C-alpha cells in the first residue's frame, strides 16, 4: 500500500509504512507486483480522470508495473476507461466482468460466470423487477442499466 495518502498508514500484508507515490524511491517499486485501484472518486472527480492520476498511471506503465482498475460501473460505461487509460485490465460490474485492452483500441471481455448462469440470473432479475414494480407503489428501475452485461 505504498500509495496511501496517510503517511502513518501501514500495509496490512507487509507491515511497511505507506506513503504517497510521489515520495517513493525507485527501490520501493521493486517490491510491487502490481497496483489495483478504484475508479470513481479515486482516479476520477466528477466522472473525469484527474491529471495527476493519469500521470501516475503512465508512470506505472513506464515502470512495468501492471495496473488493474476496478469499478461497479456497467461494461459499456467502462470501455472508454479500459481503452483510453494505460491499464492492463479493468474489472467492471462489481467484479462480474473484466475488460482487457487488446492494444488496437478495443477490449476483450471475460466473465466471472458462464453464459448459462448469466442468462439464468438475468431472467430471475427481470422476474423480481417486474414483481417489485407491480407490488411496490412508486417503485422505478435504476437508469444505469444500459451497457450492463451481468446482474
Regions inferred by a protein language model and the residue ranges of each:
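Active-site phosphate-binding/coordination module
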Residues: 49-145
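Non-catalytic pre-domain segments flanking phosphatase-related domains
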Residues: 1-37
Amino acid at each position: 500500500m505504498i500509495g496511501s495518502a496517510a503517511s502513518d498508514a501501514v500495509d496490512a500484508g507487509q507491515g511497511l509504512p505507506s506513503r504517497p507515490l510521489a515520495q517513493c524511491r525507485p527501490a520501493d517499486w521493486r517490491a510491487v507486483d502490481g497496483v489495483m485501484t478504484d475508479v470513481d472518486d479515486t482516479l476520477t472527480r466528477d466522472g473525469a480522470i484527474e491529471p495527476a492520476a493519469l500521470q501516475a498511471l503512465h508512470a506505472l506503465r513506464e515502470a512495468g508495473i501492471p495496473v488493474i482498475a476496478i469499478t461497479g460501473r456497467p461494461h459499456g460505461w467502462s470501455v472508454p476507461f479500459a481503452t483510453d487509460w494505460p491499464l492492463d485490465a479493468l474489472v467492471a460490474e462489481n467484479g462480474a466482468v473484466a475488460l482487457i485492452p487488446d492494444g488496437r483500441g478495443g477490449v476483450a471481455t471475460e466473465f466471472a460466470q458462464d453464459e448459462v448462469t448469466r442468462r439464468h440470473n438475468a431472467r430471475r432479475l427481470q422476474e423480481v423487477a417486474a414483481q417489485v414494480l407491480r407490488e411496490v407503489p412508486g417503485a422505478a428501475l435504476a437508469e444505469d442499466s444500459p451497457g450492463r452485461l451481468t446482474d
